[in-house]
Amino acid sequence: MPDIPTKRRLSNGSVIDNTNKRQMQSSFVPEVEQESDGYLSEDSSDQPIFDMAVAANSNQWQETITKVVKSVVSIQFTHVSNFDTESSIVSEATGFVVDAKRGLILTNRHVVGPGPFCGYVVFDNHEEAVVKPIYRDPVHDFGFLQFDAKSIKYMDVTQLELKPDLAKVGTEIRVVGNDAGEKLSILAGFISRLDRNAPDYGALTYNDFNTEYIQAAASASGGSSGSPVVNEDGHAVAIQAGGSSEASTDFFLPVYRPLRALRCIQESQPITRGDIQVEWSLKPFDECRRLGLTSEAERIARERFPDKIGLLVAELVLPEGPADELIKEGDTLISINDEPISTFIKVDEILDESVGKELKVVIQRGGEEITQTIKIGDLHSITPDRYVDVAGASFNQMSYQVARCYCIPVKGVYINDASGSFEFSTFEKTGWLLETVDDKQTPDLDTFIEVMKQIPDRQKVTITYRHVSDLHTESIQVIYIERHWQSTFRLAVRNDKSGLWDFTDIQDKPLPPLKLEPQNAKYINIPFENEEKQGCASLVKSFVQVRTVAPVPMDSYPYRKEIGYGVVVDATNGYVLVSRRFVPHDMCDIFVIFAESVDIPGKVVFLHPNQNYAIIKYDPKLVLADVQAPKFSDKPLKRGEKSFFVGYNYNLRLVTEDVKVSGISSLNVPAASLSPRYRGTNLECVLLDSKLCQECDSGVLADEDGTLRSFWLSYLGESNCDQTTDRMYRMGLDVTDVLDVINKLKDNEIPVDLRILDAEFSSITILQGRTRGVPQKWINEFEKVCHDELKFLSVERVAAAKLNQTPNPLKIGDILLSVNGSIVKTMRDLKIMYNKPSLDFKIIRSKKEMDITVPTVETTSLNTSHVVFWCGAILQAPHHGVRQLMEKIPSEVYVTRKNSGGPAHQYGIVTNSFITHVNDKETKNLESFMDAITDIADNTYIKLRLVSFDNVPVAISVKTNYHYFPTAELKKNKETGEWKEIEHKEK
């Protein structure tokens, strides 16, 4: 019978069942999707919560609890980075002091974690102490943290004695811990079982095995992981580890092995751990009989162990392990070295003392008793204690934990964070087994390091890999090795003395990129039976595929990789127009692909601030192909006009269709208020009622002779309410709206001096205008000149000015009548703003006609040119998408993103907020922020004052962690447009 769903007891009771991965959402600090609710969760309880049954001996329990709480601590911790089965998290748990003199705290292994750990503990009197991990068991769910005992000055820390032999069925117990994120909660229960198999928390996560678990009904929830399970005398008989998500059942780890490990630490002895890579399961005698246990063997076992109900049976045997081919699944364990076996406890005792030795193992298989001699392996040797960061991804040696889940050999290179160049899937970041890189085998981590050393930067290489959940399927992929943005190539090694992971740089700089050579490509014309459309056949020669890699989550752009199509607007000089959905900013690596054959790098040279397109430049000398720029029309499309659509659909397949323009509309793409980013504004868009066109992210509208009338672009819009998906809009941008820029590009001139009105306008009906005060004489004037739709333009939003700029005189609700003496009918009538320092408007405001002069804003300052990485937060000046949605900017230090597991995450720096002060020193911009943090030492608490996106101020404290999250900057050279990394030496 399968186990019922089980869960860990971490910070907020997040359920980790046997069909889903662990979900760590700390009640201490809200996760990214919770950030809009505030900075920190409220600690609603400063007083102990006594949730226990009142019995006749309640006075005894009261005395016991009074002593126990002085040894129990709340652990606030973070797993800094992905490693092995665990992802980077911030969470909260419980531990208890087991050696007050040495400052040793016992907690769960899934709290200590297999990888980098940072944390502190809070005692009952709210004294705080930094802790470091000194031991995490390779298999069983326990580990030890250590604090400086001298740092606790205002209370006498007591320690709990570990008494595993006092755990009996029927024993009344208390679980004393940080239940459901409360400071202290005391839960009552009775032990109901001592021989439960270890709970299963699912694949690709940590699981305990080869040990009995104690079962009780205490209804513990999140944050209670690591709580002591004490008896009436105040002895710790077990440690809280997990529980059922469908019942009040809790699972406790017996403290036999923690007690042994504690004694080894106290005696400065190594904690040896032996194993033969076999998972055993405790099965009742009736099932053992069905699997081949003889009646005589059962009789002997029942006589030897009258209180036991079964024996250990091999559940799985790992290939290439010490017991491979010697023990089979279904074998019943009888004895080890002539020692009869009935419990996991005895197996652990024997194996832990026999590492490297050969032992005689007796099993029963199919009614036959078999004796095997097996060499005992070292569990620590198959537990990874190092990882490699390179090209934005992280790798470690295959672990026993992962291998056991899928019954595979404990060997190979495991990708614990498939990001950067090794991002195979947006949804699956872990579980990948790397087999070859650049056609070279990578059987282990050291070989992988040597292979990566030989790969030049910007090189495309072929890799093969599998996912451990589907080892039958080998995947092959060409990836781009990027090491100029993410230059880190380092080895991290665990140091149990310091509690840190020591970093060693493997290669300061990658090998330089290989020289590019010209390559041939052949375009195949679009086949048409209709002779009248033969002019459109060669339009395929104007399309190029554009692949974008955005290494830094700048400007709140949600994607790292994008693929779309652009149109060559100048084949002689090498210019491509593409949607800003695919090229959001200029901190990108761009690849331009011709005829799906030739791949050359591109560079962003122009980003239009309103109209949702970017211009990319490539070197035309590197492409030996018949690349053609189309002929561009000088007449705008009109409603009802027929055209021919050529575009690329979701599958990047070329499609065509005859279409009719359904409308020309003045509009703005809806904003993503919870995550502001670039969007098209003040657009005059071509609309089509075509299902096929709405399936295409890129394309063109053309006349039958091939003359281009409109670019078909995709526009990134608002997020759905669940913040998991983004809305995309697909509309046309008339060629005439781009002709001025295209003509400049033909002269190799980049329009860097573009200016805009920093406001958004929307169309309103004549009726709305009349109601809001537009006089009849102006309505008559509009009726004379409007030939398609009668409408006014009204101010919908006014962007917040920068701190050194004068506020825009336009106000929301202003109705535009004329600009520089000409009537404003559509968005196109505002095009004169692009080269004017100011514009003279006649407007209606509050039913009054007035004249105002509105200065325009130069657009080069709208693009981000400075990014700061500090304590896991990514900071920049508020980008244009932010200012468009705000009336006033609190500071020009904007938190655009934060890394999971960093101080920013742990202490509650919220994305989309502004840092206004550091230690009460004002930080108006990034330069003043850098000045404020320069003299702040590592592992130091600092006070930050922040203002949320909704202008709610808050003050928090953040502890710096420069070891794992060093300070760095990226700055753009305004002359060359190149980005340069600036590293900072921390104090």
Curated annotation (Swiss-Prot):
GO MF annotations in UniProt: serine-type endopeptidase activity
Gene Ontology annotations of biological process type: apoptotic process; cellular response to heat; lipid metabolic process; stress-induced homeostatically regulated protein degradation pathway
A Pfam short name: PDZ_1
Matching CDD domains: cpPDZ1_ScNma111-like (cd06786), cpPDZ3_ScNma111-like (cd10827), PDZ2-4_Nma111p-like (cd06719)
Localization per Swiss-Prot or TrEMBL: Nucleus
Gene3D superfamilies, per database record: 2.30.42.10, 2.40.10.120, Trypsin-like serine proteases
Region (Serine protease): 69-262
InterPro entries recorded: PDZ, PDZ-like_dom, PDZ_6, PDZ_sf, Peptidase_S1_PA, Peptidase_S1_PA_chymotrypsin, Peptidase_S1C
Top EC class for this record: hydrolase
Role summary: Nuclear serine protease which mediates apoptosis.
Residue stretches making up the PDZ domain: 279-364, 878-950
Gene Ontology annotations for the cellular component aspect, listed alphabetically: nucleus
The entry's keywords: Apoptosis, Hydrolase, Nucleus, Protease, Repeat, Serine protease
Active site: 110 (charge relay system), 141 (charge relay system), 224 (charge relay system)
Family: Belongs to the peptidase S1C family.
SMART domains hit by this protein: PDZ (SM00228)
EC number: 3.4.21.-
Disordered: region residues: 1-29
Gene (name only): NMA111
Keyword hit for Protease: yes
Protein name from the UniProt record: Pro-apoptotic serine protease NMA111
